[in-house]
């Protein structure tokens, strides 16, 4: 993967000699096929609502403040703006998550491991909108096993509509490296939630550095911010104590907008029916023998 400066030079050459096509005349695809997708949980307000949905105590766990937390999701089920989305078989609690993602570019003089915050800032190629679709009923069951999420998340992630290169945001960073840009989500044209990207607990450069700690990030990796405050149904369910507003239904249209990037939009459709999952068999534990 070439660096940001070279990508901009190549883009300018193509633009100067190429034929233009109206955006309305093309179907956008996901802006890249990432090697991996990490999704953080970096917004304190979101954590408060989710914690309340699981208990009467809305206190953010102390562990959240100690270091960023993320999970890996599926890079092979990406959706683009305009694509249809359906809940996985057996789920009746489809939800969205309003996020922004950083995309890793060229890593000059590094294999992507143990990056400093300064190196991580330079490694960010650009930013895109990230909708982490979620089946809350499946996710809730999985999380009780103290592992996951897995099947409650891996059926679909929307990235798009494109990647805005990091240089477009450089002057917008505050003194601590945060990006105070607006982000919002609506359902069927009705505003639902909004937040500032700068309300993250850590700026993106620190998230990238943490992801590379005792590990590696590579060109094309996607790192999601986690859900913005008021950026999903489940957070509101936790605050009001019931599933109101209700889970997404076929026909609903979810639109997300981020200042400086654009918007993505997906329509919910009915899903396919699959055979029920076979539960674990209750079996007697055989006594081990030694030789």
Model-inferred region functions:
Residues 5, 136-291:
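Catalytic-pocket segment enriched in acidic/His residues
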């Amino acid at each position: 993967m070439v660096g940001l400066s070279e990508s901009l030079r190549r883009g300018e050459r193509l633009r100067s000699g190429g034929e233009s096509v109206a955006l309305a005349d093309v179907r956008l695809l996901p802006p890249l096929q990432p090697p991996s997708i990490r999704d953080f949980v970096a917004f304190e307000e979101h954590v408060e609502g989710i914690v309340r949905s699981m208990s009467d105590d809305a206190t953010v766990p102390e562990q959240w403040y100690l270091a960023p937390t993320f999970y890996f999701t599926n890079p092979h089920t990406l959706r683009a703006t305009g694509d249809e989305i359906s809940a996985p078989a057996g789920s009746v609690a489809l939800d969205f998550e309003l996020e922004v993602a950083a995309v890793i570019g060229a890593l000059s003089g590094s294999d992507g491991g143990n990056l400093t915050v300064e190196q991580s800032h330079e490694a960010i190629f650009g930013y895109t909108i990230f909708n982490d679709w979620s089946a809350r009923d499946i996710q809730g069951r999985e999380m009780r096993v103290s592992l996951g999420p897995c099947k409650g998340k891996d059926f679909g992630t929307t990235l798009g509509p494109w990647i805005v290169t990091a240089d477009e945001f450089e002057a917008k960073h505050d003194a601590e490296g945060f990006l105070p840009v607006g982000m919002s989500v609506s359902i069927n044209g009705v505003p639902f939630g909004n937040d500032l990207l700068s309300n993250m607990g850590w700026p993106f450069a620190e998230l990238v550095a943490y992801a590379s700690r005792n590990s590696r990030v590579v060109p094309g990796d996607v790192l999601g911010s986690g859900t913005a405050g008021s950026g999903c149904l489940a957070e509101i369910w936790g605050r009001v104590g019931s599933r109101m507003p209700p889970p997404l239904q076929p026909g609903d249209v979810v639109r997300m907008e981020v200042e400086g990037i654009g918007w993505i939009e997906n329509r919910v459709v009915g899903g396919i029916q699959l055979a029920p999952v076979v539960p674990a068999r209750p079996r007697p534990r055989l006594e081990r023998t030694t030789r």
